Amino acid sequence: MLSPAGKISLQSFTGSSLVFFVICMFNHYYGITNLVVNTLIVFFYAVNVYFFLKFFYNEFAFAIAIRAAFLGLVLVLGLYIKLVAPPNIQIFGGYMSVMALFHYSEFLAIAIVQPKQVSTDSFVINHSPQYTIAAVSSWVEFFIETYFFPGLKEIHWLSNIGLCVCILGEVLRKTAILTAGSNFNHLVQCEKSSDHVLVTHGVYAWFRHPSYVGWFYWSIGTQIILINPLCIPAYTLASWMFFKERIYIEESMLLSFFGQQYCDYQQQVGTGIPFIEGYKI
């Protein structure tokens, strides 16, 4: 059963997506290609959505609804850019849609498995300064290279490989969340709850940390989509270092929770990320 917050997010995400899709189709049909006009259309649509949701929802529900609606807008806008933009800009549209789907599906997955803990943080849109800096850096690289080397951003077969990597990573991560159910949490837990059990079946029989494996490859895939030769290795290294530390801390907690049971699990199943061993006793 989807929580009330999950239902609000789903209504806002799908509603915003569908309405903006209709607007984009009208826009395409009438051949409106002026950048200023299109920017104003997006701006006025966003403003109208803001006040519409503000009128109907209380503070907490509005905070969820506006984020979900924004992600729905970004999803469709990305698809529209992918369809009508110049060849060297089209891949950025695909990237926008991938980002929107990832962040919305993060919230929806938590709303399903942890309905009592869901919050605006569950969108993981701005969960750390490092994440924001990394995202902005990739945008800066993309547009600088688009300006000076437009042909680089027209290698669509390579960008499509990145899209496939993102899809596989996304599916793996969300499968891991749904498999773990109430045992999954965005934050490393320092105390074992009474209903916390060690999950070792499904994708957890493949990797000890399938949600991290999915996110690791998804993050690299986003930069392959953008064909960012600088950010691809930078994201790979930064993500690897982040998950190395995260897994080390998390496994120290899991060993204290489950003892020999987790130790045996470590012996049987790897972390899933190359050269990361985790916490060993």
From Swiss-Prot:
The chain crosses the membrane at residues 3-29, 36-53, 59-85, 89-113, 119-149, 156-181, 209-226, 230-243. The gene is ICMT. It holds the Pfam family ICMT. It comes from Tribolium castaneum (Red flour beetle). Residues 30-35, 86-88, 150-155, 227-229 are lumenal. This is Protein-S-isoprenylcysteine O-methyltransferase. It catalyses: [protein]-C-terminal S-[(2E,6E)-farnesyl]-L-cysteine + S-adenosyl-L-methionine = [protein]-C-terminal S-[(2E,6E)-farnesyl]-L-cysteine methyl ester + S-adenosyl-L-homocysteine. It comes from the Eukaryota. Gene3D superfamilies: 1.20.120.1630. It is a multi-pass membrane protein. Residues 1-2, 54-58, 114-118, 182-208, 244-281 are cytoplasmic. It is found in: Endoplasmic reticulum membrane. Keywords: Endoplasmic reticulum, Membrane, Methyltransferase, S-adenosyl-L-methionine, Transferase, Transmembrane, Transmembrane helix. The keyword Cell membrane does not apply. GO terms for molecular function: protein C-terminal S-isoprenylcysteine carboxyl O-methyltransferase activity. S-adenosyl-L-methionine binds at residues 189, 196-199, 204, 209-212, 250. One of its GO terms (biological process) is methylation. Catalyzes the post-translational methylation of isoprenylated C-terminal cysteine residues. One of its GO terms (cellular component) is endoplasmic reticulum. Its EC number is 2.1.1.100. It is an enzyme of class 2 (transferase). Substrate binds at residue 246. Belongs to the class VI-like SAM-binding methyltransferase superfamily. Isoprenylcysteine carboxyl methyltransferase family.
